[in-house]
Amino acid sequence: MRILCDTNIILDVLLDRAPFVEASAEVLKRCEIGIIEGFTTTSCITDIFYLVHKQLHDNERSYQAIEQLLTILRVADVTNSHIAEALSHRASDFEDCLAAVCAKSIHCDFVVTRDIKGFVGFDIPILTPSELIERMEL
């Protein structure tokens, strides 16, 4: 199974955001041990660094968070054609639209996010972390 992890899932774990951290951590754990092939986008990486640094006020811990993340998830490149396709959708949430376009281009089965409404209208299934775990346990 191939998934694209949205920014909020990763931040739940890195910033220990209750009550979401448990399910999000389980998704990343399954990626880490190879049960799931997990991806994020290049733009997500820069957003995560910025938001972790803003919260922790610690450059070194922010760099370490990204280094650790890169041992768990693969990074899907954002290309000119992805951006052009996302722009053509005229979606209200461009960031989520771009993530959906990238996920489709690398043949992900799902986008995993807590921001379901940001991904409405795209031709890729969307699951919350809890829904993904539940689906895998059936």
Set out the residue ranges of the language-model regions.
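Short, well-structured N-terminal submotif of metal-dependent ribonuclease cores
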Residues: 1-40, 54-61, 121, 130-138
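Active-site-proximal, substrate-binding regions of enzyme catalytic domains
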Residues: 25, 47-74, 79-81
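Short, conserved alpha-helical segments within structured domains
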Residues: 40-44, 82
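Short loop/helix-cap segments at secondary-structure boundaries that form the rim of catalytic
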Residues: 117-124
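Active-site neighborhoods of divalent-metal-dependent phosphate/nucleic-acid chemistry enzymes
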Residues: 71-116
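A short acidic, helix-capping loop that chelates divalent metal ions and anchors anionic groups
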Residues: 12-14, 47-48, 84-86
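Short acidic-hydrophobic, aromatic-tinged amphipathic segments that line or gate anion-handling sites
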Residues: 76-78, 126-129
